[in-house]
């Protein structure tokens, strides 16, 4: 069954010119890019996206980071797309959890500046796709 997930290549990935490398890894895994946009993120969109972190001490720095420059937002499709992308992304902590061979394991050092975001469940993917790509069907 085909599944959809939201992938963000965060401002650090864009600034470091890793967009092509990251998209290539997604496609080499067998996933398909269904939509792709370079965006400057508004404070409102950032707050909605990270709403579950609103009461955490790092929320302000997270908003500052995600709005610090352009990012790439993509809808990625394929069998088990959510789990497949999270596998190639690697653990959230790029040093302690992400293994070499993953995007974060190969290119990131800091937890917040960890290059990519991927939805953590099909339900989150549907919510996030609706937020980042209004009007897109989430089938």
Curated annotation (Swiss-Prot):
Q: Where found, per UniProt?
A: Cytoplasm
Q: What GO molecular functions are on record for this protein? A: ATP binding; metal ion binding; nucleoside diphosphate kinase activity
Name the Gene3D superfamilies on file: Nucleoside diphosphate kinase-like domain (3.30.70.141)
Q: Which InterPro entries match?
A: NDK-like_dom, NDK-like_dom_sf, Nucleoside_diP_kinase, Nucleoside_diP_kinase_AS
The entry's family comment says: Belongs to the NDK family.
Please give the function described in this protein's UniProt entry: Major role in the synthesis of nucleoside triphosphates other than ATP. The ATP gamma phosphate is transferred to the NDP beta phosphate via a ping-pong mechanism, using a phosphorylated active-site intermediate.
Known PANTHER family for this protein?
A: NUCLEOSIDE DIPHOSPHATE KINASE
Name the UniProt record assigns to this protein: Nucleoside diphosphate kinase
From what organism does this protein derive?
Mycolicibacterium smegmatis (strain ATCC 700084 / mc(2)155)
